[in-house]
A protein has these predicted regions:
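Domain-level signature for soluble enzymes in the chorismate/prephenate branch of the shikimate pathway
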Residues: 1-302
């Protein structure tokens, strides 16, 4: 049972005891992370695992109860996860942050940690070069929009398995007090997308210009796939279409083989462009439960 409200000194002692236990667990967690890092090195796995991070946060949100805000819980764990990536390897972020739109910096900081090395760049090309040249592990760029005259994503199309691709969508856990100039963002980096249970996949379809958007979308739908975003860029006699698909659909999925076959020679190439774990919804972030019912001397919640 909690102390009575009139016993402030005992309540503070209770909080201090909880803080000590939380701190002890953080120390223990860092010790386990060091062993995980060694295991990843032996298995030649990347320290940065965005899919795993999303699964951790979703699991905690699902089990959460009490008055502590879910959005704050997510932010705390984002800081902790960012710190543990730093414990495992070098990690830096390149951010598109033009003078007139600083909101992307806030999104990057909130997701990748306030103590993670971050560099601001005034052009999208600089961000892409920082990632492709290895000066940054991740680059944060604006969400693609339909009708762009020179979309940044067309510069990253490659068959190379090690080429940078989309790894996350920001914000994952709500915008908080981040500046609202600029819409959401996509993060690009190297690595293989991991299935998390709630995913989006991006593919780029290079085709002749005489194949219509409607035909592409009808073909996708006929295969039982759901397109959640579509943008195209035309150049000379060819077009590149960025297609976002609901769910985890790797480039080797038989349905994408059928997509290639149905479009035939009109489809020149179908390239993977990464994907991301679906961010938490506003409804999930607003979730709350009952109040505090115990402290460190009993069953602690909150």
């Amino acid at each position: 049972m909690l102390p009575t409200p009139s016993d402030l000194a005992e309540l503070r002692r209770c909080l201090d005891e909880i803080d000590d236990k939380l701190h002890d667990l953080l120390i223990k967690r860092a010790e386990v992370v060091s062993v995980v890092a060694a295991s990843k090195r032996e298995g030649k796995l990347a320290a940065f695992q965005p899919g795993r991070e999303a699964q951790i946060i979703r699991r905690l949100v699902d089990r959460h109860s009490g008055d502590f805000p879910v959005a704050t819980l997510v932010r705390m764990w984002r800081e902790m996860l960012a710190a543990t990536v730093q414990l495992q390897s070098m990690f830096a972020v390149a951010v598109f942050a033009p003078i007139e739109s600083q909101g992307f910096w806030d999104l990057a900081r909130d997701h990748y940690g306030s103590h993670t090395p971050m560099s601001a760049y005034h052009s999208i090309g600089q961000v892409i070069r920082a990632v492709t040249e290895g000066r940054a592990s991740v680059g944060v760029l604006p969400m693609p929009q339909e009708g762009e005259t020179d979309p940044w994503w067309r510069h990253l199309l490659s068959k190379d398995e090690d080429a940078p691709r989309v790894v996350a969508r920001l914000p994952f856990g709500g915008r908080g007090n981040a500046r609202t100039d600029g819409a959401g963002a996509l993060a690009i980096g190297r690595g293989v997308q991991q299935e998390t249970g709630q995913d989006r996949v991006l593919v780029a379809a290079e085709s002749s210009t005489d194949i219509s958007r409607g035909r592409i979308l009808r073909t996708i739908s006929s295969l039982g796939l759901v397109c959640t975003f579509f943008a195209s860029y035309e150049h000379a006699d060819s077009a590149v279409n960025l297609i976002e698909i609901e769910g985890f659909v790797p480039i080797t999925d038989p349905r994408l083989d059928s997509f290639r076959n149905q479009l035939g020679g009109a489809l020149h190439r179908l390239l993977p462009f990464g994907g991301y774990a679906v961010p938490l919804s506003a409804a999930v972030l607003a979730k709350s439960g009952g109040g505090l019912t115990g402290c460190a001397t009993g069953a602690a919640k909150g």
